[in-house]
């Protein structure tokens, strides 16, 4: 299955709690942290919910 590189580019401080949980669910911990996640509908949903804090490649 394909993977997607996701990087956290903005702080989670003061954000909507559900968006913070989506970032945590993707495995991101700090600004500049990059992870590769499987390109599944579940992960795409989390990315779409918090897109304004992320950079997505692939």
Curated annotation (Swiss-Prot):
* Gene3D superfamilies for this protein: Ribosomal protein L30, ferredoxin-like fold domain (3.30.1390.20)
**GO biological process: any one?**
translation
What keywords is this UniProt entry annotated with?
Ribonucleoprotein, Ribosomal protein
Bilayer-crossing residues are: none
InterPro entries assigned to the protein according to its UniProt record, in alphabetical order: Ribo_uL30_ferredoxin-like_sf (IPR036919), Ribosomal_uL30_bac-type (IPR005996), Ribosomal_uL30_ferredoxin-like (IPR016082)
GO cellular component: a single term: large ribosomal subunit
The record's section on SUPFAM superfamilies has:
Ribosomal protein L30p/L7e
A GO molecular-function annotation: structural constituent of ribosome
CDD domains given in the database record = Ribosomal_L30
Quaternary assembly:
Part of the 50S ribosomal subunit.
Protein family membership: Belongs to the universal ribosomal protein uL30 family.
Q: Supply the NCBIfam families for this chain.
A: rpmD_bact (TIGR01308)
Q: What is this protein called?
A: Large ribosomal subunit protein uL30
What is the species listed in this Swiss-Prot or TrEMBL entry? Pseudomonas syringae pv. tomato (strain ATCC BAA-871 / DC3000)
């Amino acid at each position: 299955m394909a993977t997607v590189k996701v990087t956290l580019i903005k702080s989670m401080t003061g954000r909507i709690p559900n968006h913070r949980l989506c970032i945590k669910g993707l495995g991101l911990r700090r600004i500049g942290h990059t992870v590769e996640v499987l390109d599944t509908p579940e992960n795409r949903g989390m990315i779409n919910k918090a897109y304004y804090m992320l950079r997505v490649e692939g």
